[in-house]
Structure formats: structure tokens, C-alpha cells
Amino acid sequence: MRCIGISNRDFVEGVSGGSWVDIVLEHGSCVTTMAKNKPTLDFELIKTEAKQPATLRKYCIEAKLTNTTTESRCPTQGEPSLNEEQDKRFVCKHSMVDRGWGNGCGLFGKGGIVTCAMFTCQKNMEGKIVQPENLEYTIVVTPHSGEEHAVGNDTGKHGKEIKITPQSSITEAELTGYGTVTMDCSPRTGLDFNEMVLLQMENKAWLVHRQWFLDLPLPWLPGADTQGSKLDQKETLVTFKNPHAKKQDVVVLGSQEGAMHTALTGATEIQMSSGNLLFTGHLKCRLRMDKLQLKGMSYSMCTGKFKVVEEIAETQHGTIVIRVQYEGDGSPCKIPLEIMDLDNRHVLGRLITVNPIVTEKDSPVNVEAEPPLGDSYIIIGVEPGQLKLNWFKKGSSIGQMFETTMIRAKRMAILGDTAWDFRSLGGVFTSIGKALHQVFGAIYGAAFSGVSWTMKILIGVIITWIGMNSRSTSLSVSLVLVGIVTLYLGVMVQA
């Protein structure tokens, strides 16, 4: 029950008889999947890391100068030179200075002077290139087991952590007691890494434009250079003062770290953890659930008494969490739990925790359910010790219907072409059915709530027949489409 503690939660229902479900995982959100005769699973994308990004260029932002040497020549004696000029570690500058009798020359005129100083970089920053194949996604999969301490953001024994990379996009997660779920994921970072560079300075990193990074007026060396002795543009951090006869002072500018922080104002800051860079983005995953099975299907129903351990908790997702404790004998057994109308005639709402079970007597079990809007009864156990709890859920069915439809339409837009199976004609039609169910399932469920299966089919046939006999082309097409969608959802989908 990992998703209960996360505000941004999406419910995805599988089509009856379907073997796969498409989901979209984003940071800060959680997805709960439900399918007929399959366990309810929670999926959360907890981390996206860039592993071992390649270094494009290193910039020096703080340096020191040592071993300053100056050589000068009188007029007509040629150009002065120093051996240090051949050493890449030194920064040198040639100048001309006035010479004469007062400073050791027999002729008056311009004489040459050269000054060199050893340039040592003390602090640098790096620009790294991140490729999609360097990204690693960490997902936690948690079945709705109902066990104690399995509620909220628990990452202990109840969840299975799996890693997704572009090289191994298909991964299987073994869920103890529930079988195996297969995930086929397609990473989508939303960033164009060809135009962006990660600028890393100490324990902070920013995402900057590639050309801006390459144009920085600072000493630099290629990313492949591990020695640090072949810095280019060393003169950008060095100032040679005006020469005087045989002397020339040279100074180094102070640390450029503050100036870089100012220049990076407004740039996207990237979080870091254990030396790895953390990114946002989303994963489009196709779940294959044919190897999953419900736990405790062979158990009999619990016949003893239940008690509610804590007050029923309402979540921010329109669901409730009931914490019950079995006081009877015969465990392990299934928990009889239903949500009924006030007349006890119709079963309403749904169980998010499918097939809740008790494994041990007097051991609390968490059950998540979604009650209908308005008044209803939550019935736990069987007679004579049956619990009957009244519950009222606030809200508007129409508003909830349109909100759910918008969320599902957004999900389908993100999934794009990965939601479709074009390998066969049957795959195309199956994909169409899943798309209709994902987007219009909420509207269909609200419009035909409580209507029998045969009546749904009859309504679909009538709407289609009216459309085929309409004289208005636009009305005819609209009614036929609505009728076909109604027929399909009525026949193929247990919405």
C-alpha cells in the first residue's frame, strides 16, 4: 500500500482478459494497477540517476602562480626568451619596455621583455555529457498485501526494488506469494542532451546550454586530460602589469566561484546523491501480468468475529483504509468485506485491496476500498458477528467522472504510440479497446452504474440504430460512434 501516502496517485484498470497494462511513472507520483483475478500493485519511480557521465571539458575557477621569472634585452639585442616558455605549465607574456643609460643599456629605445609564471589550478568545475543510455531508473513495486506496517512510504520487506536501464528495459520482479510481473519500459527524460551540458561544481550541478558552456572565458582542458598540465586560455585568469625595465609583476585573479554562481542564476539545478546526478522525467511501461496470481484464493471465508482496530481513515484519493483484526478461528482465511447501499440490496464501490486475507489470528490487516459517493454501509464478516459500519463520502459524481477522464486522456497522450500493438490485426483491435477503456471508462461507469449487462447492450444497439437512420450526416456519425463505443465497453469491458 505504498501509494496511500503519496498525493499524486493514478489508478489504472486492466481490461478483462487482458494480459498487459500501460502505465506512466513520474517522480512525485504513484500508480496503482488493478486487473481481474490479479493482485493490486503499487508502482513508484523513486530515482533517476545518471551513471558515470563522460566529461566534456574542465574549467579552472581558482589558481595560484609560483616561480615567476623575467628576462629582458636592450634595444637591437634581439628578442628575449625563457626555457619556461616551452613548459605547458607556465603562462608567459612578451612585451616592449623603454630602455636607456638609466637601466643598463647603451642605446635608448624599446627593448624586449618576457615574464613567465607557473600556473597551478586549485579548484575546477566540470561539464559532463549525459546520454540516455547512462540513465538508470529505480522503481519500487509493492503488492496490496494488507500486512501491518505495509502502509505509506514503507520501503522494507513489502516492496521490490527494480532497476531499469535502456540496455535492459525489460525486467521481471518476483513478488513473494504473488508470482512475477514483467515490465517493458521506455525511458522519456524530456531533455535534449545533445544541446545540454551538466555543469558540476563541487557538490552542486546545473543543466546549461552546450554553446554557453563552451564559450566560458576561463582556463580549460579537455575532459580526457587527467594530468591537468595542458590548460588552454590560462591568461584569462592572469594579469601582467606594466613592465619596468627588467621587472614585471604578474598576479592571478581571485576565485571565480562566486561569479559562476551569479551567472547560473535561473539555470535548472540538478540534485546529487552519492556522486550520481538525479534527474526528472517519466517512464512509459507496459506491464505483463500473465504470471501473477492472487494469494489465498483457496482459503475459505472467515466465519468468526472481526473488530475495527482504528477509526476508518479517508485518503486524499477518494478511498478509505480499514484496519481490522480477526478474533475467530480457522485462519488463514478470506475477509468477507462488501460495501452495500442503505437497503442492503446492491453491492457498491470496489475493493482496491483484492481478495484481502487474514494469515494469523489477532493480527491487524489493512484493507483499502473505494466507497460510492453519498451514504453506504461497509459490511465486514458474516452473521451473527457481522460488523455494519455507516460511511458517507462527499463529492460530485459528475466532477469525479470528468476529472478521471482528463487524467486518463493525459496518460494516453504521454503513452503515444507505445500504447498500440501494430504487429497483428488482433493487436490493433485490442489496443483500441484498451484506449477506449482507459479514456472513457469513467464516463461509461458513471452513466451506466447499476444498469444490467443486457440493458447496456440494448442501449448501445438502439443508439447505433438511431444513428444509422438519421438524415443528418454529423448526427448520424456521432450517434453511430457513441453506439459502437457503448457496445464495445458493454461487451468487452467489465467497467
From Swiss-Prot:
Glycans are attached at N67, N153. InterPro entries: Flav_gly_cen_dom_subdom1, Flavi_E_Ig-like, Flavi_E_Stem/Anchor_dom, Flavi_E_Stem/Anchor_dom_sf, Flavi_Glycoprot_E_cen/dimer, Flavivir/Alphavir_Ig-like_sf, Glycoprot_cen/dimer_sf, Glycoprot_E_dimer_dom. SUPFAM superfamilies: E set domains, Viral glycoprotein, central and dimerisation domains. Gene3D superfamilies: 1.20.1280.260, 2.60.40.350, Tick-borne Encephalitis virus Glycoprotein, domain 1, Viral Envelope Glycoprotein, domain 2, Viral Envelope Glycoprotein, domain 3. Disulfide bonds join C3-C30, C60-C121, C74-C105, C92-C116, C185-C285, C302-C333. GO terms for molecular function: protein dimerization activity. Keywords: Clathrin-mediated endocytosis of virus by host, Cleavage on pair of basic residues, Disulfide bond, Fusion of virus membrane with host endosomal membrane, Fusion of virus membrane with host membrane, Glycoprotein, Host endoplasmic reticulum, Host membrane, Host-virus interaction, Inhibition of host innate immune response by virus, Membrane, Suppressor of RNA silencing, Transmembrane, Transmembrane helix, Viral attachment to host cell, Viral envelope protein, Viral immunoevasion, Viral nucleoprotein, Viral penetration into host cytoplasm, Virion, Virus endocytosis by host, Virus entry into host cell, Zinc. One of its GO terms (cellular component) is virion membrane. CDD domains: Flavi_E_C (cd12149). GO terms for biological process: clathrin-dependent endocytosis of virus by host cell; fusion of virus membrane with host endosome membrane; symbiont-mediated suppression of host innate immune response; virion attachment to host cell. The chain crosses the membrane at residues 446-466, 473-493. Non-structural protein 1: N-glycosylated. The excreted form is glycosylated and this is required for efficient secretion of the protein from infected cells. Residues 98-111 are annotated as: Fusion peptide. Residues 467-472 are cytoplasmic. Residues 1-445, 494-495 are extracellular. It comes from the Viruses. The keyword Membrane applies. Isolate M2 comes from a patient with dengue shock syndrome. The transmembrane domains of the small envelope protein M and envelope protein E contain an endoplasmic reticulum retention signal. This is Genome polyprotein. It comes from Dengue virus type 2 (isolate Malaysia M2) (DENV-2).
